[in-house]
């Protein structure tokens, strides 16, 4: 009776329309809600999938400055003739040119640039283009800066990949040449890489695209500049798809390190076919084990065709931080697995075993190296107070072993002094052993650790108020461009203002007679029952300005200047 009653409600002039079709509507690939084909986003508010951007979409950013951590000025510039997703690199700098005049020689600074688009490089070498190309002009007027993405070491350590891959990622992330991953546009990232003939600056572009089709699941596309672009119509089976490069995993680790990015790029983190099964982001909190049990229970259930994406998000929920997983579960309407109270008590009430809390010698030595780095500041005079450490005897034995590396026997101290301490604690008679190191390479060999290599020089920039700020200097060796671009190499070297401090060890100037020592002093048994001794490190450092030794200048104003106070006035009340 009900179907007949519904048919009677149809007006007579619509009775001959025929069978209903799906013309003009389409299903949302994520939640299955029917939407109009002209719709920009899903009308299901809990879904919010964006189908396409409207006509008022903001244009792609023309030029973005890359954070290099040095004086090197690198820009990511859009190639207008190729589309919004094609970008290139431009390097800007300042070069000094001497001009001979009647009055003498005038040294002027000229802004110059180098565009790394092959066509622009070729045109510059052949002398076809006299003025700057359009990419350099865009870089000169650039005011936008890339957004650095944080990479958590816990995420990188949890990456179930080859040790070589993790080691390469860690080396790139710890190099003082800016962040590992930077966001240039919504879909394009700039990733650090090893400098090569193809990537001279040590950076490349990586893009994450998502093409949504009305008849199938979203198609996720990743392209990296280190890969060769396949023909558009070539069909490559999923089983034969090329493995993802190291830059792809670098971006995913950066996405998983931030909750907002993990939600935005959850499709890439959750996608099984892209080879992300091996990436696991560690969870923090009491419900870490419950999330694992949820994954196992979801994986044990058979997957249905209509719930492919829901089950996929459930299986790979370990790819995202816990909050992101919870938000996805709320959106999809799934119930969280029940966690028994005994499990909660076991996870939350787990006590820290004090016997397992240890500090290795290399971790301690890395802290010493970091103290030396902090002390070598351009704003101070280069003669710091001794660095004092209280360490066990075993740590100093390991340090003394490093001091003796290269010699057949244990190196004896340069001097041994016995002294009586009466004016300060602890009181008593102590022995002090002193080593003088006059070779900078030996100092670096003693203090180098995998986590914290010793930096012999440190770079700084001067602020407007006269203070100085640390500016990490790059160590990227840019290989020569092809021989066909030989004329570019003959351009003057770009040398911006350089402010550096350097460790004074040995003879640092031609007229120096006595070498400057790096002094290590050891006083054992300051705490005799605990076997703790006192280690003192004394050193000096100098200042460089544009490659020349500069005298220290105190940026602070002198305190002996009299203050000028306005005269007081007498106010009379009527």
Swiss-Prot record:
It comes from the Eukaryota. One of its GO terms (cellular component) is nucleoplasm. Residues 297-317 are annotated as: Disordered. It holds the Pfam family zf-tcix. This is Uncharacterized protein C2orf42 homolog. It comes from Mus musculus. The lineage of its organism: Eukaryota, Metazoa, Chordata, Craniata, Vertebrata.
């Amino acid at each position: 009776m009900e179907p007949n009653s519904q048919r009677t409600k149809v007006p007579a002039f619509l009775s001959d329309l025929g069978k209903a079709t799906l013309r003009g509507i389409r299903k949302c690939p994520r939640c299955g809600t029917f939407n109009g084909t002209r719709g920009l986003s899903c009308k299901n508010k809990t879904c919010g999938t964006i189908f396409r951007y409207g006509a008022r979409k903001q244009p792609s950013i023309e030029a973005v400055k890359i954070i290099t951590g040095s004086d090197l000025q690198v820009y990511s510039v859009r190639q207008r003739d190729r589309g919004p997703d094609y970008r290139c690199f431009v390097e800007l700098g300042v070069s000094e040119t001497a001009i001979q005049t009647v009055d003498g020689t005038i040294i002027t600074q000229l802004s110059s640039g180098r565009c790394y688009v092959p066509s622009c490089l070729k045109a510059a070498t052949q002398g076809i283009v006299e003025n700057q190309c359009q990419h350099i002009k865009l870089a000169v007027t650039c005011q936008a800066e890339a957004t650095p993405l944080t990479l958590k070491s816990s995420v990188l350590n949890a990456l179930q990949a080859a040790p070589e891959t993790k080691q390469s990622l860690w080396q790139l992330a710890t190099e003082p040449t800016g962040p590992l991953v930077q966001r240039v546009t919504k879909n394009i990232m700039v990733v650090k890489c090893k400098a090569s003939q193809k990537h001279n600056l040590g950076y490349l572009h990586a893009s994450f695209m998502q093409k949504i089709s009305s008849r199938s699941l979203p198609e996720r596309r990743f392209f990296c500049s280190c890969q060769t672009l396949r023909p558009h119509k070539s069909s490559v089976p999923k089983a034969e798809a090329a493995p993802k490069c190291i830059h792809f995993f670098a971006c995913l680790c950066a996405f998983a390190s931030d909750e907002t990015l993990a939600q935005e790029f959850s499709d890439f983190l959750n996608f099984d076919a892209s080879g992300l099964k091996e990436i696991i982001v560690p969870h923090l909190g009491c419900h870490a084990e419950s999330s694992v049990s949820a994954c196992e229970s979801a994986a044990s259930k058979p997957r249905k065709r209509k719930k492919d994406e829901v089950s996929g998000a459930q299986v790979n929920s370990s790819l995202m931080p816990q909050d992101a997983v919870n938000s996805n579960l709320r959106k999809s309407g799934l119930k969280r697995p029940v966690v028994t109270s005994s499990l909660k008590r076991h996870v939350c009430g787990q006590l820290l075993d004090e016997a397992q809390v240890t500090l290795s010698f290399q971790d301690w030595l890395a802290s010493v190296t970091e103290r030396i780095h902090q002390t070598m500041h351009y704003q101070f005079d280069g003669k710091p107070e001794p660095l004092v450490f209280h360490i066990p005897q075993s740590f100093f034995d390991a340090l003394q072993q490093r001091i003796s590396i290269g010699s057949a026997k244990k190196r004896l101290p340069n001097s041994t002094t016995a002294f009586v301490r009466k004016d300060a604690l602890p009181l008593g008679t102590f022995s002090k052993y002193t080593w003088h190191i006059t070779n900078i390479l030996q100092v670096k060999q003693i203090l180098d650790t995998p986590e914290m290599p010793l930096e012999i020089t440190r770079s700084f920039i001067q602020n407007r108020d006269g203070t100085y700020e640390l500016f990490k200097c790059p160590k990227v060796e840019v290989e020569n461009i092809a021989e066909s671009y030989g004329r570019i190499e003959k351009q003057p070297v770009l040398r911006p203002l350089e402010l550096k401090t350097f460790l004074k060890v040995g003879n640092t100037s031609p007229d120096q007679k006595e070498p400057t020592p790096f002094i290590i002093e050891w006083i054992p048994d300051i705490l005799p029952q605990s076997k703790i001794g006192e280690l003192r490190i004394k050193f000096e450092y100098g200042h460089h300005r544009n490659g020349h030794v500069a005298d220290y200048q105190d940026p602070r104003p002198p305190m002996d200047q009299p203050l000028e106070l306005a005269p007081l006035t007498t106010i009379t009340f009527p």
